[in-house]
Design a protein with these regions (language model features):
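C-terminal binding/interaction regions
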Residues: 24, 28-31, 35, 92-153
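Short loop/turn motifs at secondary-structure junctions and domain boundaries
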Residues: 41-44
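Short beta-strand scaffold segments in enzyme catalytic cores
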Residues: 47-53
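Compact, glycine-rich, soluble single-domain proteins
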Residues: 64-78
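Short, solvent-exposed cationic patches
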Residues: 75-96
């Protein structure tokens, strides 16, 4: 059975309110925290949850899904993005990412490139295991990116 860490959710909620995040971003963070609970990570035990906010206001959740062959593993960020894209999402406004770590968990290089594919001005909300948040952007995490605009110019 799924066990939700309510204390963790409450701490994240309080930190977000104190940071004056808008209500949709609060929902996004809560969705990422909930998604982490479904992580399939029997090899690394490194659970990650993510949630995207599409430009039209929809939220899609994803968790990391490991595979014994490692290369077939899918990160939480890409799971959430691919879920949204498979439902018609063409651009992303924001993504929230959380793990069980005390430090903030940043998206890997592949995930940064995939995020950039669906938005060059994406807000990135990182949440640690204390419920503290850090705001970033895809421009900050992937400067001078190779994007679809590069090919279309």
């Amino acid at each position: 059975p799924l066990e939700i860490n309510w204390e963790y959710l409450l701490r994240a909620y309080i930190v977000i309110k104190e940071a004056n995040m808008n209500e949709r971003y609060t929902e996004l963070v809560n969705a990422a925290i909930a998604a982490k609970e479904f992580s399939y990570s029997p090899y690394s035990l490194f659970r990650v949850g993510a949630a995207i906010l599409s430009e039209d206001g929809q939220i899609f959740k994803g968790c990391n899904i490991e595979n014994v062959s490692y290369g077939a593993t899918n990160c939480a960020e890409r799971t959430a993005i691919f879920k949204g894209v498979s439902e018609g999402v063409k651009s992303i406004k924001a993504i929230a990412i959380t793990s069980d770590e005390e430090d903030f968990t940043y998206p890997c290089g592949i995930c940064r490139q995939v995020i950039c594919e669906f938005g060059t001005e994406v807000d990135i909300i990182l949440v640690n295991n204390k419920g503290e948040t850090r705001m970033s952007s895809i421009e900050e995490l992937l400067p001078s990116s190779f994007s679809k605009e590069t090919l279309l110019d």
